[in-house]
Amino acid sequence: MRAPEDLPDDNPGSVAPYEVGQFVHDNLELYYEVHGQGPRVLVFLHGILMDANMNRRLAADLAAEGNRVILLDLPGHGLSARPQRASFHRMDTYAGHVLALLDHLGIDQAVMGGVSLGGNVSLLVAAQAPERVRGLVIEMPVLEWALPAAAITFVPLLLASHYARPVVGVVAKAFRALPRTGNGPFDSVMNMLSAEPRETAAVLHGVLAGPIAPTVDQRAAMDVPALVIGHKVDHVHPFHDAQQLARRLPQGQLIQANSVLELRVHPERLTAEINGLLDSAWSGPAGRVRRAG
């Protein structure tokens, strides 16, 4: 791994230096970042079509509290490989890449977490390899109540990426030419708008075609410290999904965010809650994520 150059001190989006690396899994080169050191590991995953930029400040803040936070760009996102076949972008396939990252870094157990897509993938990691999950941090899960709104939102994007490809391609090229700001969440949105339409279509198709979350019985078997963050702003991330997930997880705790952007714009309160979850997950014996059925 290598450390990037320090960002300017006067850049409001700057964070402490961190290490970056790549590894290959299923013939795909995947990019990751490691913030901080030590045995208290959190893997935190980005939302759909976003990348590690959106969570970099959170990673730095948690690293300053003695945690090791790992950010992974999933296939089709950020600096990782961008295969244009939908089969590469199923959420359960993404979960396999996360487990391969733990193997690559020699990590036996980690707290798993993420926002939206990343939260769902974290739940699938817990279902696939329960012995490796120490706890869960799930921000804005997309579960049963979200499906109609998610379909209404993403199916038009998928169709536009297929059938309006020349127009979308021109827009993406224009965004690629724009300088990045150093503000992680804003740059993550710019990177999303810069993607080639075939890449975007493959991600959306794969995510919509495959399983989006573990079964209800599998969720009920995840007996580890779990923090669920929800909000009441948009229908793609309905607060009811967050409520139901927190109730279903044996150790689930629900926190209501003040807005969809609180953890990115005014992160102090929620960052403290996440650090408290990490304290609980790593302070005693490991909980149990059982294999349902």
Locations of regions flagged by a protein language model:
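Flexible "cap/lid" loop of the alpha/beta hydrolase fold
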Residues: L123, A127-Q128, R134-Y163
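Catalytic active-site module of serine/aspartate enzymes centered on a nucleophile-bearing elbow/loop
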Residues: Q251-G293
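Hydrophobic, aromatic-rich cap/lid helix
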Residues: S188-D217
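Active-site loop/oxyanion-hole signature of alpha/beta-hydrolase fold enzymes
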Residues: L71-G113
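Short beta-strand/loop motif that positions the catalytic acidic residue
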Residues: M222, V228-G230
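Conserved alpha/beta-hydrolase "acid-adjacent" motif
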Residues: H235-D241
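Gly/Ala-rich beta-loop-alpha elbow adjacent to hydrolase catalytic centers
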Residues: G114-G118, S122
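Conserved HGGG/HGGXW glycine-rich cap/lid loop of the alpha/beta-hydrolase fold
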Residues: L28-A81
